Amino acid sequence: MGGTGLLAATADATRAAARTRKARARGGDGTPEQIHLTWGENPATSVVVSWASPEPATRPRVRIGQRVIWAESRPYTDGISGETVWTYHARVGGLRPGATYAYVVTADNDSEAADPFTATFRTAPHGRAAFRFTSFGDLATPNTAWVLSYGQSAYAVDAVESFQPLFHLLNGDLCYADLNPTVQPEVWRDFGNNNQTSAANRPWMPCLGNHEVEFDNGAQGFTSYLTRYTLPDNHVPGFGGRWYSFRIGSVLFVSLDADDVVYQDAGAFVTGPAALTPVAGTGHPAIEPGTSFYVRGYSGGAQTAWLERTLAAGRDDPSVDWIIAQMHQCACSSSATGNGSDLGIRQQWLPLFDRYQVDLVLTGHDHDYERSFPVRGADASAGHEVATGAVVNTLRPHPVTTTDNGVFDTSQGTVHLTLGCGGTDVNLDDYGVDTADAQRQAKVFTRANRPVPTSTADVFTRAGADAVEDAIWSAKRDVATGYGIAVFDVHPDPEDFGGHTSITVTQYHAVDADPVNPATGAKGAPTPDYTEFETFTLLRPRRSEPR
C-alpha cells in the first residue's frame, strides 16, 4: 500500500516554521500540534482530545458544532534540558455510540485561527458489535537525527490509516527520547507530529515501555508520557495513567506497565565515560556513569492486585467474551539479537492470564513479529543458565497444541504476539536456535542485569539474558523483515463458527524495509508497501447474557 509519510513530515516542518513566525508576531505561538485522541471513560460516549503548542496557548479549546469544550493545560519542565512543554487535554463526553464527529482544535493565539485544525473521529459501538483495531509497538520518529529513529515510522503511521481501524494499540517504546537525553522534548515533538496523521482521527492507546523511563522526569521517569496522555482512570491512588482498561463491544482491553514486574534493567542508562549533566537551571546534579533507572516493583504490588480485580470482573461479566492484554515487554519472545523473554512477567501475570482465560497478549520490545501457540501453565526446570549450563526454572509457557492449523480456541490457552515492528532503525528479525538440537531457542531474564564496569575506564554495560530455553511455544516468526502491522477484526456473531465468536488476525509486513536484513545481509530502505504475511483466527465460546 502506498504512502507519502516522509514527504508529509518534511512539509509539516516547513508549515510549522511559517506558523511560528506568524504567531510570535501576535505574542506567543499557541498553534495546536501533536494532536491525538484517546478513549474517555466510556469509548461509546467519550474521547479525550490532546495536543501541545510551541508556547503557552490562550484559552485552548475544542469545538464540535456549536459546542465548545475548554481544555485543561498541563505543562511540565524536562528535567535534563530545562525546556518547558505545554500540553492540553479536552475531555469530550455526551457523544452518541457508533457516531462520527468533526472537531476543531484552536486557541486565541492560534496562528491558523482563520483556518484551524479540523479532523473527524468515530465513537465505539454500543453492545456486541463488529469492529477493527490495529497494533504495533516500538515506533520511533522519521527524524534520523535521533537515536533509533528511521523513516519507516512515517510509513507505519500511514499503514494504520490505510486500514481505517476504530483505534490503534501502541505497545510501548513510543519514541526513544531517553536515548536522546539532552533533547527529549524535541524527540517527543517529532513523534507527536508524525502520529498526528492518524492519531487525530482515531484513538491511539499506548502503554509504557522501558524507553519511557527518563532521568529526572518524575518518580518512575514517566512525566513526559503522563503529561501527554490522558488515559482511562484505574482508580488506584498515585498511579494514574500507568495502567488502565477499557471496554469496546464484547472485548475487555487491559493495558499494563511491565516495567513494574520485569527483571530486565532496560530503562534510562548512562554508559559513560562522561556523566549526563542537566542544565544548571534544573537544579539536578550530574548523573554519573554506570547509573541506570531501574523501576521494578515501583507499585508495591498495586498493579498486579488491580489486574486480578479487573480480570475477575471481566470474566464474571456475561457480556464480555474476549480479554486482550497489552504490555511492552515479553513473556514469549525468541529473539536472538533482541531482549527475549522475562521471568518476572511469567511469575506475576501469566498465572492470572491462565486463571481468567486471557485470550491474547500484545507486546513490543523485540523489533520483530512472532506468534506463540496457545499456552497454559508452565514447564518446570526447562531452562539452562547461559554461563554454567545449570538447570534454571524459567517457567516456560506450555503450549496446549503445537499444530499450526491457523485456527485456535483461546478458551484453552493464551496466544502471545510480539509486535515490536513499528519503525525503529534497529530491526531484530533474527531468532534463536539451539545448535545442539536445532530447536527454536529463547533467551530469558531470570534476574536483574544491573550495570557493570567494562575494561574501559568509566564505561559500563548491562548484560543480556542469563538463561535460555527451547522455545516449544513459538509457532511463527517473520524472518523476512522486522517491520509490520497487525490488523484485528472482531466478529461477535457466532453463526460462522458454531456458537463461537471470532477474531481474525492478519499480520502485514514491509519486506525490504530492514536497513540490513540479518538473515540475508541485503540492504533495504523505508517502504510504504505492506503485504500480507499471515492470517489466523481466534475462537472462543460466546458468553450467554441474562435475558
Could you say what each language-model-derived stretch is?
Residues M1, E161-S162, T410:
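Flexible, charged surface loops at secondary-structure boundaries
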Residues A9-D12, T144, L179, D216, ...:
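Residue-level recognition of conserved structural "scaffold" positions that shape functional pockets
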Residues R26-R242, E308-A313, G338-Y356, P374, ...:
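Divalent metal-dependent phosphoesterase catalytic cores across multiple superfamilies
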Residues M1, S299, I345:
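Conserved acidic
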Residues M1-T14:
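N-terminal export signals
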Residues G3-T4, V92, F253, G377:
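Generic N-terminal initiation segments characterized by hydrophobic and/or small/turn-forming residues
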